[in-house]
């Protein structure tokens, strides 16, 4: 399905593959009920450039998410344990209300980073993944939304 099909009522959802900010900019204001996303954790994990792109800290990107959400709409954004706080600040700076956090607890942690030359792990092994719970401010009262 396409975004247009959802907006017209012909479909209930759409999965879109593409640059998220470019796609968000094609969407009208206040047309989305909720957003669940898992941006890069900005750790540069295993030397990967995509995981150190600055996307999670990009206030302008979060402002676009805020723009397309309906008043009172929620954002759930997964983050890394060492970088969650910076992402939460960027989300708040974009205009969201930080409502809470959820911690997805794993039975075992993520694999440790490894410097093969040293023969040992070089990072902690977290066993949870923090999730920011944020809300677009309401227009008026809770009952009116």
Label for each model-derived stretch:
Residues 2-145:
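Core catalytic lobe of class I
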